[in-house]
Each structure stands twice: as structure tokens, then as C-alpha cells.
């Protein structure tokens, strides 16, 4: 019809975490965006451990999706089967897509990440676990990476007299490409708080209770050290969420569950399917990297739209042939040098700034976190 507006391309973003939300918001003005997310609110996971010891933080970390998109919509559902150009939800609804963005992230044991979909249930679980933790005199944290170290600091900041023990099979704290000086500083601060760190020897058997359950038990490391605790938490175990991939996309899923991407963050072998954040092979699994990747993905989809690829009815569905990356002027994601911020309570911790030799002092960690 004369004078009618051209159809806008459809973009389906699967996953409403840091990466997915940023991509969806950035493309809301140029596409019909559908954000698919099983949770009823955005979860600010960075503050989840603080909320466990201080439930007053709960309203700050669960942020409803209402008002996120001006033109698009948020669908509270789970992706059950995703192929290029088509998303089948757990409810049975099917969503066509000119562009697909896979931003489903990863799962991680509670309390670092919520494992329930409704905010009311998440609040109830956190409050119950807080009460159990408050009543415990001795706490075992299995895993001495960033989560275990941070949780130890949060617990000691609120309950200084609690006995908190960290145990890890690794020979040092904070696995990954980080400077020995940073690891030494974190060990020093933990020792200053009276937190024993048992390294280089796994537990003979897992604790006989569920994580977060208040019940006294004793476990032993293979080195022979016994640890008695009243409650424990699992502080390891990142698992990419990608089991929904089907058809031509299934081949992009690696043995470890990560989705293989090109430097432009397109899924290998696909022109209009992108993956980013924890679920992709693009970079380290931190919120900052997800945000930087979102800028690249949103910019590249916008470039493809402006180049004429993918408007509804023009070039078919996601995954079909479109202009080459060079022809559309797509940007490549450049991973940053290793960097991390590890708080130990509200006033402690340290970090490694990307590309810098200097360690972050505790006061800067407090500001950044």
C-alpha cells in the first residue's frame, strides 16, 4: 500500500541476562525485538552473594522487565528447540526470526546464581538459606575461585565469629590467567580474616547434605584433613546453557556446551545467528565481557539491517545466505587482556585491571563492585 512503512526485521534474543538485555535494548528502534527469558525479572547476579548475607539487597538485584523495550516485547518462556530462523518455546509457541541472538548464559550453583524463575520464589529461597546460614557456626565452601573467595568475605563481614573454610583441588586460589601477586594478596586477606584455605587435595566424598542445608557433618580431604561444618555451599561448576540447539545449529555446540563463534560473534557457519556471553567461546565468562560483546552484536545486526539483509520478506530467515561480513562492514570482537575484581567483604579484596601490572586496592574494588 502506498505510504505504508516497510516491514521491520524480526530479532529474537534468547536470554535476558546482561548480554541479551543490552542487545535487545540496542535494536529496539530498528527491529521487531522479542526477548525470550524464563525468569520474570532481570537478575543482577553480581550482587547475589551480598544479598545472601544481607537480604535487604534483594529488591536491588531482581529488576522486572516491564518497560525494558519500547517497541518489542518480552516473552516469559523457555526456548525448547532453536534452529536457524525458528524458535520453538516450551509452551509450544513458535517465533520466526530474521535474526537470532543466543544469549542464554550459563548455570552456576546457588547462591551465586538463582535457579528458580519467579522472583517471589527466589526471594523465599534466599531468605530461607540466609536463616540457615545465620544459624550455622561453621561453614564449608567447596571451591576457592572468585565465587568462593567472595562468599567467604561476605560471610565474615556479617558474622566475624563464624568459622569459614575454603577447600579446592587446585594448588592455588583463583584459577585462571591471573598474576601470582593477585592470588597471594587474596590468600593474605583470607588469612587475616581467619579463613583456612585447604588447597591441592579434593574431598574424599562430597558432603552428605544438600548445599545450603543446616545439618552438621564431617568430611575429609584426600590429604587427611578433617573438616566439620554445619552448612556448605558449592562454589564451582559453570555450565553453558545450550541444550536447546537443533538442526543446523546443533553442530556449533562444542563438547563442553559452548557455542562456537567467529570474530564477528556470528555462530560458525551462520550469517544471521549470533551468540555471546557465557554460552559462547568468545571470551572469559564475566559480565563486563558480555556487555562489550553486546555492543558488537547489536552493531553488526544493525549493519546487516542497513545493508538490506533480513528485512521481513527480503532475504528469508536467520541462517540463510546474507552479505559477507566484509560487505556489510561487520565489526570483530577483541577480547580484553585478563582482568578481574574479587571483593572480600564490603571493604576488602583485590583485582587485576586488564592490561595493567598494578593490583587494585581494596577501596577501588569496593567502588567497582
Describe each PLM feature range.
Residues 48-54, 114-121, 249-250, 357-358:
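Short glycine-enriched, charge-decorated loop/helix-capping segments at active-site entrances
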Residues 118-137, 226-299, 303, 319:
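FAD-site-proximal beta/loop scaffold in flavoenzymes
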Residues 17-20, 145-149, 294, 298:
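Catalytic nucleophile loop
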Residues 72-77, 81-82, 87-88, 95, ...:
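A Rossmann-like FAD-binding core segment of flavoenzymes
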Residues 2-10, 70-140, 233:
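FAD-binding core/adjacent interface of flavoenzyme oxidoreductases
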Residues 2-73, 150-178, 353:
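Beta1-alpha1 glycine-rich phosphate/pyrophosphate-binding loop at the start
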Residues 19, 105-108, 238-240, 347:
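Short glycine-rich anion-binding loops that position phosphate/pyrophosphate groups of nucleotides
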Amino acid at each position: 500500500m502506498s505510504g505504508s512503512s516497510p516491514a521491520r526485521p524480526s530479532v529474537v534474543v534468547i536470554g535476558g541476562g546482561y548480554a541479551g538485555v543490552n542487545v535487545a535494548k540496542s535494536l529496539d528502534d530498528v527491529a521487531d525485538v522479542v526477548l525470550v527469558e524464563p525468569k520474570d525479572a532481570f537478575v543482577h547476579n553480581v550482587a547475589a552473594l551480598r544479598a545472601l548475607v544481607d537480604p535487604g539487597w534483594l529488591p536491588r538485584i531482581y529488576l522486572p522487565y516491564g518497560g525494558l523495550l519500547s517497541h518489542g516485547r518480552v516473552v516469559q518462556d523457555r526456548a525448547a528447540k532453536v534452529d536457524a530462523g525458528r524458535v520453538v518455546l516450551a509452551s509450544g509457541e513458535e517465533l520466526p526470526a530474521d535474526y537470532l541472538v543466543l544469549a542464554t548464559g550459563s548455570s552456576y550453583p546457588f547462591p551465586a546464581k538463582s535457579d528458580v524463575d519467579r522472583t517471589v520464589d527466589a526471594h523465599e529461597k534466599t531468605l530461607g538459606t540466609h536463616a540457615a546460614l545465620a544459624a550455622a557456626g561453621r561453614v564449608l565452601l567447596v571451591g576457592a575461585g572468585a565465587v568462593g573467595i567472595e562468599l567467604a568475605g561476605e560471610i565474615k563481614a556479617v558474622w566475624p565469629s563464624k568459622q569459614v573454610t575454603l577447600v579446592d583441588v587446585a594448588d592455588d586460589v583463583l584459577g585462571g590467567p591471573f598474576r601470582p601477586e593477585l592470588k597471594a594478596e587474596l590468600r593474605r586477606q583470607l588469612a587475616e580474616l581467619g579463613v583456612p584455605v585447604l588447597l591441592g587435595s579434593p574431598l574424599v566424598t562430597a558432603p552428605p547434605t544438600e548445599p545450603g542445608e543446616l545439618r552438621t557433618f564431617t568430611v575429609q580431604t584426600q590429604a587427611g584433613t578433617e573438616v566439620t561444618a554445619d552448612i556448605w555451599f558449592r562454589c564451582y561448576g559453570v555450565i553453558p546453557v545450550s541444550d536447546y540447539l537443533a538442526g543446523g545449529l546443533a553442530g556449533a555446540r562444542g563438547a563442553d556446551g559452548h557455542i562456537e563463534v567467529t570474530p564477528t560473534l556470528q555462530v560458525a557457519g551462520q550469517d544471521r545467528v549470533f551468540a555471546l556471553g557465557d554460552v559462547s567461546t568468545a571470551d572469559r565468562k564475566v559480565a563486563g565481557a558480555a556487555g562489550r560483546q553486546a555492543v558488537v552484536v547489536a552493531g553488526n545486526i544493525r549493519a546487516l539491517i542497513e545493508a538490506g539483509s533480513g528485512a521481513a520478506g527480503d532475504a528469508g530467515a536467520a541462517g540463510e545466505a546474507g552479505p559477507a561480513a566484509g560487505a556489510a562492514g561487520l565489526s570483530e570482537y577483541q577480547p580484553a587482556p585478563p582482568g578481574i575484581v574479587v571483593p572480600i567483604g564490603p571493604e576488602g579484596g583485590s583485582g587485576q585491571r586488564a592490561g595493567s601490572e598494578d593490583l587494585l586496592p581494596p577501596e577501588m574494588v569496593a567502588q567497582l563492585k
